[in-house]
Amino acid sequence: MSGERAKRFPLALEDLKREPRKPEGRVAERQAAGDAARQRLTAAAAVPAAASPIVPERRAPHGGVFAAKPARAKQHAPAAPGAAKRAPQGGAKQGDRSAAPNVALSGALALTSERVRERMVERLRANGVADPRVLAAMSAVPRHMFVDPGLAAQAYEDAALPIGHQQTISKPSVVARMIELAAAGRALERVLEIGTGCGYQAAVLSRVARDVYSIERVRPLYERAKLNLRPLRVPNIRLHYGDGRVGLPAAAPFDAIVIAAAGLDVPRALLEQLAIGGRLVAPVGEQAGEQVLTLVERVAPAQWRESRLDRVFFVPLKSGVI
């Protein structure tokens, strides 16, 4: 090598060769790194589960169990204790709502049972109603179907109940008494009722007479009576919307006429439509004064006999239609 080259390269080529790195060193480094990682994992596992919360097991909808698992990284903050208590309360309310129809259903079943009506019939019998046809009719007709649902619990009490439009459904004792007086043990072919109301008395009459004609002057009550009677499928009732004081001359004569409203007297038109031997039952008197249940019998073409019986109270008998 020349002197100039020796100055530029003071080391010989042999001196520039490096010994190759032994592979054992690289493997040892990897092993050390792995040991350190395992130590970190072991330490993390030993720490309480605050960094990795565990979701408690919960029941599956069909009885299985969901396994506990770590919560996801993004998770909403846990609900406050008060919120945790509110959820069961909501479920309890839902349960109460679902249970309410069962309670109402049980009450309805008890209300509509034959035993309830039989107790009403026993009271009627004890109060003097003796006609077995009338008692059977009162037992068969479900009175609760003719009153508002809010009054259904009182349906079989001996009380007059409002049906709207300043009208009432008569007491069971009064209904039975009037029908028994009108029938008087006879087989009734044709009966006229003045004042259909909700249709209850017409339904009872339909089980005593062959044909029942009923007139109502208040249009909404006339429509309501049709709806009330429809589920019973009563084939022998003919409802009419009109003035009850006029009667139904086209269908006369009638074996019996029952008037469910009080007038100062019995309209002459109704007396004329009563068959000879027929009986008319009506309350007579002022609304603010004394009213008396009155029996009128037609004994001849131009002769009627009147009997004054029980003190009663009815809504007034009015003319015209509304």
Swiss-Prot record:
GO cellular component: cytoplasm
Family matches, as PROSITE patterns: PCMT
Pfam families: PCMT (PF01135)
Active site: 170
Segments for region (Disordered): 1-101
EC number(s) recorded for this UniProt protein: 2.1.1.77
Location in the cell: Cytoplasm
Protein's UniProt keywords contain Methyltransferase: yes
PANTHER family (UniProt xref): PROTEIN-L-ISOASPARTATE O-METHYLTRANSFERASE (PTHR11579), PROTEIN-L-ISOASPARTATE(D-ASPARTATE) O-METHYLTRANSFERASE (PTHR11579:SF0)
Function comment: Catalyzes the methyl esterification of L-isoaspartyl residues in peptides and proteins that result from spontaneous decomposition of normal L-aspartyl and L-asparaginyl residues. It plays a role in the repair and/or degradation of damaged proteins.
Protein name: Protein-L-isoaspartate O-methyltransferase
Species, as recorded: Burkholderia mallei (strain ATCC 23344)
Organism classification: Bacteria, Pseudomonadati, Pseudomonadota, Betaproteobacteria, Burkholderiales
